[in-house]
């Protein structure tokens, strides 16, 4: 991803555009800063919140809001589909969407990439960052949530496993 800018675009209440290759909605995109060409990195995203490139592993990780639960941490793979609006561990807040978007629970069984980690109920997932080396070698990413949590992941463990969760007093903090 050298010389590239990565960014994400949510589906902006146009959920089926996340599955259309000719739309930017629901996608992670890269733009080469030298030749200005862009590429679709992945598709099938609902509402991406955080995006980080881990250079030492050549890995992209993202966080994404699900519908009424089903917030996700994803390992992004080039050309892969993450399932929205067909697969999610969340549920619709409005019954009128259930018929045309059944939200199948298994991503893998339906041909999509499974999240590394999902949260039901929702944690209001937000940013994901690589842990700076000055914090030591114990953790590789921090994931924040909209309220009281900061989740850490140990470097030697699978990214989807939360090793430690720090809870903040909700009177004083909202983490983004």
Model segments located where?
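Beta-propeller domain segments
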Residues: 2, 11-175
